[in-house]
């Protein structure tokens, strides 16, 4: 799994090579220090070497220490650069992949999980890479070199550590074996907590309006407790590593002291050599400990890597078909056709149809309205036109060509859309409007704002078009937000303009002005509007009435008043509501 991610370190390969190279040199330098110290004790202090030998060996130790320090710092810097580069590349490629996801893909992963994968999971992989680029080279070099020196110095005494190492490795393997599933569960609980927090922050106004803070606290406590329990389950296994390793280390040191003291007493080993032996034993045991730490980090990193690779290798449900490349496309006129369309949200094909047997033609330049009760599939219907979802059965055609045969960018460039949830981004009013068309002139910007009845309130803002909007446009009203979104869509001069309940927050007079602007300025544009108020759609060229999953009726307002019980019921209920409110 980690091998799959290693290709994403491109651009930072030199640092990824430098880090282990320099850490290997550092380990070799540290290998000679105990030997020099043993010489100082045995030859300089207890022997005939005197101060001359001590100075010579001391300068050698100083030179090796400086070289070791330089190599260690270089390795640390290189590993940091390489790991940060890997993290940057992973985040960039994941974010780019997410931009290609369809709505169904987003629903499948969930936005909270994608955020966790893009941040927490990548950070874990990044930290593990930084540590392992150093430890996984240092540990084997140090372990093997120190063991070889120990064998040369005293093979019998080395047996103490040779017996302990397999026991340590077995215990480490048993602990690590049970950790991967626990870390995977831990990451999933982070997803759950993030989802709870995200929902709360997005809906904080609703929470306060309905006095649901205590309910939200209880929901957060549940997610938080589940994360704590998952974390504890993983940590309880992990904390076994330290006492197990320390026990093995102290047992080894006691064994070396016991047997080594006997060797010194019998003259088979010099005091300085015993000191050096102790140093090498510590190096060997610390190497095994480093391997344990790396394995622990790798266990969690593998769990995170699986989640990251799952995103990177996901094939978007909706993508350009091979046939769409280089295809001659029809002239952009704005004709929309639904032919025998069935649709269900379940990717497996199970579940009930949200839309069934939809046959509908919208001619170029027509003003078509879609009405119906809540949950009848109105938004789903229009979401099929820009191919946010693919039909389960049948065809959706734009200008006579199946939407699946268009390059996605070309299809969506023909469509301007104001979604049911009005989204504005942090930045200026101008920057938000230019999402519609980045190369629009100032005059076009002003005209689009006027057409959407947004110009007056924009100019009343402190900096006009250069007034900054907070994230999500929270510093403008719901009606102002809707009008800015309409202006953004109109600035695009689309062949097809789709408005999904986009005037629900504006008053009737303003809505009438927007409708008049459509008739004057969008004569050649096909307008499809979803609305709850009959007053918003009664002048449409065609009104489509959805009921459950199918088209119950279609026609003009006058025709439907004569032929459709559902439409007549909607109209009469709104008239009665208007009288009651009056």
Locate the predicted segments by residue.
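A short amphipathic helical element positioned immediately N-terminal to and/or at the very start
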Residues: 1-13, 114
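Transmembrane helix-loop-helix hairpins at lipid-water interfaces of multipass membrane proteins
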Residues: 13-74, 78, 151-156, 267-271
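ABC-type nucleotide-binding domain
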Residues: 329-582
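An intracellular "coupling" helix at the cytosolic face of ABC transporter transmembrane type-1 domains
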Residues: 10-14, 79, 100-104, 120-133, ...
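Hydrophobic alpha-helical transmembrane bundles that constitute the permease/transmembrane domains
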Residues: 20, 24-32, 66-73, 125-128, ...
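Conserved catalytic Walker-motif region of ABC-type ATPase nucleotide-binding domains
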Residues: 98, 220, 308, 338-340
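Helix-loop-helix
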Residues: 45, 50-54, 63, 149-163, ...
């Amino acid at each position: 799994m980690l091998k799959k991610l290693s290709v994403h370190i491109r651009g930072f390969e030199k640092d990824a090579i430098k880090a282990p190279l320099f850490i290997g040199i550092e380990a070799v330098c540290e290998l000679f220090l105990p030997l020099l110290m043993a010489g100082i004790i045995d030859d300089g202090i207890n022997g005939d070497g005197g101060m001359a030998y001590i100075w010579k060996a001391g300068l050698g130790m100083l030179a090796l220490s400086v070289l070791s320090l330089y190599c260690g710092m270089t390795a640390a810097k290189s590993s940091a650069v390489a790991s940060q580069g890997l993290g940057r590349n992973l985040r960039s490629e994941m974010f780019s992949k997410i931009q290609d996801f369809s709505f169904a893909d987003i629903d499948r992963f969930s936005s909270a999980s994608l955020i966790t994968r893009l941040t927490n999971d990548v950070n874990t992989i990044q930290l593990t890479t930084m540590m392992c680029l150093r430890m996984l080279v240092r540990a084997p070099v140090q372990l093997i070199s120190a063991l070889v020196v120990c064998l040369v110095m005293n093979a019998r005494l080395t047996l103490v550590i040779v017996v302990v190492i397999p026991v340590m490795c077995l215990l480490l393997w048993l602990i690590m074996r049970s950790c991967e599933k626990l870390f995977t569960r831990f990451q999933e609980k982070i997803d759950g907590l993030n989802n709870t927090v995200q929902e709360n922050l997005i809906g904080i106004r609703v929470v306060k309006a309905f006095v649901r803070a205590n309910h939200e606290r209880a929901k957060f406590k549940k997610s938080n407790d589940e994360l704590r329990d998952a974390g504890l389950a993983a940590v309880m296994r992990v904390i076994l590593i330290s006492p197990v390793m320390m026990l093995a280390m102290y047992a080894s040191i006691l064994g070396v002291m016991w047997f080594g003291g006997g060797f010194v007493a019998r003259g088979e080993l010099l005091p300085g050599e015993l000191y050096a032996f102790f140093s090498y034993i510590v190096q060997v045991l610390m190497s095994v400990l480093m391997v344990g730490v790396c394995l622990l980090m790798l266990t969690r990193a593998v769990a995170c890597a699986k989640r990251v690779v799952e995103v990177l290798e996901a094939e978007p449900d909706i993508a350009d078909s091979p046939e769409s490349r280089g295809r001659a496309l029809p002239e952009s006129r704005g004709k929309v056709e639904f032919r025998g369309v069935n649709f269900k949200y379940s990717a497996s094909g199970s579940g009930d149809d949200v839309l069934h047997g939809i046959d509908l033609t919208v001619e170029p330049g027509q003003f078509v309205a879609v009405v119906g009760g809540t949950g009848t599939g109105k938004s789903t219907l229009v979401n099929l036109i820009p191919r946010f979802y693919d039909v389960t059965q049948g065809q959706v055609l734009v200008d006579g060509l199946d939407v699946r045969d268009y390059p996605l960018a070309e299809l969506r460039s023909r469509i301007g859309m104001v979604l049911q949830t009005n989204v504005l981004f942090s930045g200026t009013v101008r920057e938000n409007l230019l999402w519609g068309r980045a190369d629009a002139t100032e005059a076009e910007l002003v005209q689009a704002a006027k057409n959407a009845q947004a110009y007056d309130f924009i100019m009343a803002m402190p900096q006009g078009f250069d007034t900054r909007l907070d994230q999500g446009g929270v510093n403008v009203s719901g009606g102002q937000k809707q009008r800015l979104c309409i202006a953004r869509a109109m600035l695009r001069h689309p062949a097809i303009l789709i408005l999904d309940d986009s005037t629900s927050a504006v008053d009737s007079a303003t809505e009438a002005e927007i409708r008049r602007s459509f008739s004057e300025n969008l004569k050649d544009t096909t307008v499809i509007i979803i609305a709850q108020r009959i007053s918003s759609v009664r002048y449409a060229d065609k009104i489509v009435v959805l009921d459950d999953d199918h088209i119950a009726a279609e026609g003009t307002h006058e025709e439907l008043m004569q032929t459709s019980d559902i439409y007549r019921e909607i109209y009469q209920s709104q008239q009665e509501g208007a009288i009651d409110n009056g």
